[in-house]
Amino acid sequence: MSTAPKDIETLIDLMARLPGLGPRSARRAVLFLLGKNRRLLAPLGEAMTAVAQTARDCLNCGNIGTSDICDICTSEKRATGEICVVEDVADLWAMERAGVFKGRYHVLGGTLSALDAVGPEELRIPKLRDRAVSEGATEIILALGATVDGQTTAHYIAEALEGTGVAVTSLAQGVPIGGELDYLDDGTITAALRARKSF
C-alpha cells in the first residue's frame, strides 16, 4: 500500500513506464523532484506539454520535428543524392551528433522481425523505394544494427531497391575506436577482419 498522495503516485506510475525506469527508479526520480529540486517540476511539465502538442513525425523521412516536413528534409544545405536509412529516431540523432553525414535520412521505425510479426509495410520500406526513385537518390546507406533482424532488414531493402539504379551501401562493422580485441565478441572480430582495408 502506497503512502504517497494519489497525484504523486500517478506520476510515479507514469514515469515507471519509461525505458530504463522501473517502479523504484521512478519513485526515486519523483522524490528527487519533490525534494530540493522542486523548481524543475513546472518547467518539466511545461516542456512535456509543449512536446505533446507540437511534436510530429516528418511525413517524408519519419524524423521527429515540429512541422509536417522536418528541418533536415527542407534544408537546402543537405545532399539530396544520399539517403541514410536508420532503424529509429535515436539512431538519426546519433548520426547527426557525429556530424559527418550531410545527406538526408529515412527512419524505418524498427526492423523486420518474424518473431514479432513486423513486416515491410510496418517499417516504411515501400516509402523508401518511392523516395529513392522520386528524389533521384544515387546512394542508400544502410545504417542498421549488426543484429540478425538488422541484417535481415538490410538484405530485404537491398533486394527491394534492385532495378532502381541506386547504389546500396552499409556502414562498416568491426573494432570500435578505443576497443581492445580481448574484449570483443567473435562476431565483431569476424566482421572487422572481413571489412579490413589497406593501411
UniProtKB/Swiss-Prot annotation:
The lineage of its organism: Bacteria, Pseudomonadati, Pseudomonadota, Alphaproteobacteria, Rhodobacterales. This is Recombination protein RecR. SUPFAM superfamilies: Recombination protein RecR. The keyword Glycoprotein does not apply. PROSITE patterns: TOPRIM. Residues 81-176 form the Toprim domain. A zinc finger (C4-type) spans 58-73. The keyword DNA damage applies.
